[in-house]
Amino acid sequence: ALYPTFFDTVRLNEPLWTFCRQFRAGSGRVWVVSTGSRANIDNVMRHLGIGGPTAEGGVSETGFHSGVTDPAAPLGRVDGILSGADVERPKPAPDCFLEAMRREGCTPRETLIFEDSAIGIEAARRSGASYFVVKL
């Protein structure tokens, strides 16, 4: 019963998502890292029209489709998703960001994090990566 009310308040940060799409077009990689459940992350991304990672450009195990032209993901897709269940210690511990970096094969020096919550900002700071504070 909470989802319809919650989804009414969820809005895409257009400037941030434009940056992410341009970054991906230039060979950058974009991940969603959240302490939320994978089901909640998937539901929010579907609501916003953002697709998740796929194998060979098909449908991922979560049902997301790849590609900007796919009607199921009209705004494009991300390269990876990490949920709270993927790490032992949630934010403000840096584990979620460090695990995403490990999976992507990059270092904190090669990583840029965008965060909107106090605990997320603390986790980003503790990860050693550069970060921006996003106001929603």
Please describe what each predicted stretch is:
Residues 117-120, 131-136:
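Short glycine/proline-centered loop/turn elements that form peptide/ligand docking sites
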Residues 23, 104, 131-134:
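Alpha-helix C-terminal capping segments
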Residues 1-28:
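Metal-dependent phosphoesterase signature
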Residues 29, 130:
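Residue-level detector of anion-binding/catalytic polar loops
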